[in-house]
């Protein structure tokens, strides 16, 4: 900027990052609503949003400018993961409408090459399909390719540029995977307890940010990856769990050549001989300021009836678009469902699942995760947090679950519900409906010992026969209680003992078995 001033070049700077505490660059104007004292109410504009405001001010006709550039503002706002609330939400909604009806040639070509139906474009489509392809060019040092795509009016040139960007994105994915594997090798299988700070002279500067995001999610910690060049390095930083990266870097700035960004993502420059000091200082700051607890997945609805996931119901959720950061799609969950099939897709980067909920089957996809790291296996039970979406493939329309979190099912809560006669939980126990052999085995156990079910779920489960699922054992006890084979003063399995009734009990006619058979 000093050189620009010396040669008489007038420069206007637009930005949306934190300004820090250093002196602002010498320019005709610095436009950033995060400057101290700036009165503009929306502090979460994307960089493209700030540029739009400048264009509106220069043109004097905001409506005209927005009509011309709403599509680019939408793409940039979603790509930069800005909160989709308030003004940002309105801007993206306006841009999606333009993208769906009259996209510029470059974006239209990109949507064709990405197999995106423009009439069904959503903010999520931008975030997961369009934005990565556009960003790939800049990450690999060819930003002009993306710029040309967005500016061209020639449909043929647009197609050629879109093909080139898709190829660059494939290269970016391969480089990212290599970096991620190398980063894990540096960690040597250890589980760090402070922000991850890794460095290498083998990594690609434009891709380390994506790898850092993946590491942050994998280890539930902030991650910083530094690309070394001689005795200096440039790093990309990604937060996790609400930890404010910008404030952390500011607190450790004595070890840095410079830094910038915001709470969730930042960049830095560092001398190689300061790396260890910086890592130690950041660890100390993290331990003193780390979030009180890791963020939990907050689900809006527990699905226990597959009819809730009908195509019509899922399509109705689209009326609330655009979804995104700070305005996510409704999160739903299923618990204790059968995991019928597992397969890796996308060269092993993603996990496809087929689950069974009562009598219905659903396909699910979990991006950037594997069955091994999650500890999942076919035939097991799983809890999933997900957003439902419509999937159309070869003329077939179905509901697909886009998984946000997965874990092996812990049957203790289900067992507790069965023992306490909570019929609202029986749907999740259909997999464990006992057969005659199960009933015989449990009854013989009861008869051959002075059986008492115990006063807690833990005491009951401690008596489960070896090799039998705890849920199946609990159902057997609940059925025996319903038929009178067991008696209990409190009406639940807790404290139940053998009742010594005369005659045979019809186990299959019990309400519990009837409900389980219909699940």
Language-model regions: role of each:
Residues 1-2, 48, 206-210:
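Glycine-centered tight-turn and secondary-structure capping sites
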Residues 1-24, 30-32, 178-186, 216:
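N-terminal small/polar loop signature for handling phosphorylated ligands or for N-terminal nucleophile
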Residues 3, 50-54, 91-94, 277, ...:
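Alpha-helical scaffold elements adjacent to nucleotide-binding pockets in ATP/GTP-utilizing enzyme cores
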Residues 7, 59-277, 345:
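Hydrophobic helix-and-loop "lid/oligomerization" segment in the mid-to-C-terminal part
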Residues 16-17, 33, 81, 136:
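Generic detector of well-ordered alpha-helical packing
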Residues 17-22, 29, 37-39, 230-233, ...:
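Short gly/pro/ser/thr-enriched loop/turn and capping motifs at secondary-structure boundaries
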Residues 24-78:
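Short alpha-helices
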Residues 157-161, 168-199, 251-519:
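Mid-to-C-terminal polyanion-binding domains and interfaces
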